[in-house]
From Swiss-Prot:
Signal peptide: none annotated. The lineage of its organism: Bacteria, Bacillati, Bacillota, Clostridia, Eubacteriales. It is an enzyme of class 3 (hydrolase). Keywords: Aminopeptidase, Cytoplasm, Hydrolase, Metal-binding, Metalloprotease, Protease, Zinc. NCBIfam families: peptidase-T (TIGR01882), PRK05469.1 (NF003976), PRK13381.1 (NF009920). It comes from Clostridium novyi (strain NT). This is Peptidase T. One of its GO terms (biological process) is peptide catabolic process. InterPro entries: ArgE/DapE_CS, Bact_exopeptidase_dim_dom, Peptidase_M20, Peptidase_M20_dimer, Peptidase_M20B.
């Protein structure tokens, strides 16, 4: 346990917050700094073919030490932390032998991790938790994944008696801004399949994610002096409100769960003359996903018929798809991970990802990639925490998957 925790504490000291407004790759310099450090550590521990490219993708190989015909397995995690909150000067706090009560993160600022807000924390009574000090996020998403993969590789190198096939590892930049797979060289990586280590609760295994589209709307109004505006003015803000009201009221993130999809308005800025709106559309079912996009198009067409052609301009683009259709043909990769989770003494929880991962994109690039847990909770904010035992269990699962395939 100590090794994975120490690595995690080291990696969260690097500020690697990604920036969605940047056109650079990686989007922030801190990611390249961490990439170079990881490459240095990989070389030092004895991995081969260690590389960091100009976009900060780190790749390395652990060569096989068995004559058996064993598939080449990849493990992938991302180095960046979410833009939602600062990841600079993270001050982790240890809560040992957690007693099931509220945790004071920052007395001075009265920031408290409350059981009533996050009841799942009671699952960890008696365990050691790592929390924030309430002023930053923690960075378990996904530096816990990085630390877990690094620890597993170090263990295999230090224990050559454990037989294994070729293992490939990669650490990616900019996952949090949706660009983690943009420059991922699948051919160079050269694995038969892979796993991202980027999930949440201990025991989780994910191989289904949303189909996703992004929507940008520009509404053109007609501004006329309000004193003489009757039958002349078109207020673009009002049209925007009308557009929003034409979408299903309850099919939004705050009223959906499990396999339910949604429309989510993420930006709405306007004047009488011009309003800009942004939505994301999400659904697990491809048919329902296409129907949601058609609904958005129909709403726009209706408003253009009412207010005049070109009043509402629509840009809609698909962002990623449900990896399930690419993972199903090689379902053994899910079955093996499920078995590995069981064999290390956990109860596997197969859950749909209400979001996307690098693995979703990679699966459509020819590298089927389900997602394994890191053990963390409440990612992207000051209430993020991770139980230390969950991190060592994640290491155990990585090692167990490799072991099961080497038999």
């Amino acid at each position: 346990m100590e090794a994975v925790v120490n690595k995690f504490l080291k990696y969260i000291s690097f500020d690697t917050k990604s920036n969605e407004d940047s056109n650079a790759h990686p989007s922030t310099e801190g990611q390249m700094v961490l990439a170079k450090e990881l490459a240095r550590e990989l070389k030092e521990m004895g991995m081969i073919d260690v590389s960091v490219d100009s976009k900060a993708y780190v790749m390395a190989t652990l060569p096989a030490n068995t004559e058996n015909h064993v598939p080449t397995i990849g493990f992938i995690a991302h180095m960046d932390t979410a833009p939602d909150m600062s990841g600079k000067d993270v001050k982790p706090q240890f809560v040992e032998n957690y007693d099931g009560k509220d945790i004071i993160l920052n007395k001075e600022k009265n920031i408290v991790l409350k059981v009533k807000d996050f009841p799942e924390i009671k699952d960890y009574i008696g365990k050691t938790l790592i929390t924030t000090d309430g002023t930053t996020l923690l960075g378990a998403d996904d530096k816990a994944g990085v630390a877990e993969i690094m620890t597993a590789m170090e263990h295999l190198i230090n224990h050559p008696e454990i037989k294994h096939g070729t293992v490939k590892i990669a650490f990616t930049p900019d996952e949090e801004i949706g660009a983690g797979a943009d420059y991922f060289d699948v051919e160079k990586f050269n694995a038969d399949f892979a796993y991202t280590v980027d999930g949440g609760t201990v025991g989780e295994l994910e191989y289904e994610n949303f189909n996703a589209a992004g929507v940008k709307l520009t509404i053109h109004g007609r501004n006329v002096h309000p004193g003489s505006a009757k039958d002349k003015m078109i207020n673009s803000i009002t049209v925007g409100n009308e557009l929003h009201s034409m979408l299903p009221e309850n099919e939004v993130p705050e009223h959906t769960e499990g396999y339910e999809g949604f429309y989510h308005i993420v930006a709405f800025n306007g004047t009488v003359e011009e309003t800009k709106m942004q939505y994301i559309i999400r659904d697990f079912d491809r048919k329902k996903f296409e129907e949601r996009k058609a609904t958005m198009q129909k709403v726009v067409d209706t408003l253009n018929s009412k207010y005049g052609e070109g009043t509402v301009e629509l840009q809609m683009n698909d962002q990623y798809y449900n990896m399930k259709e690419k993972v199903e043909p090689v379902h053994h990769i899910v079955d093996t991970a499920f078995k590995a989770i069981e064999e290390v003494g956990l109860v596997p929880k197969v859950v749909p990802i209400r979001g996307g991962t690098d693995g979703a994109r990679l699966s459509f690039m020819g590298l089927p990639t389900p997602n394994l847990f890191t053990g963390g909770h409440n990612f992207h904010g000051k209430f993020e925490f991770i139980p230390t035992f969950a991190m060592s269990k994640a290491v155990d699962v990585i090692l167990k998957i490799i072991e099961l395939y080497s038999k």
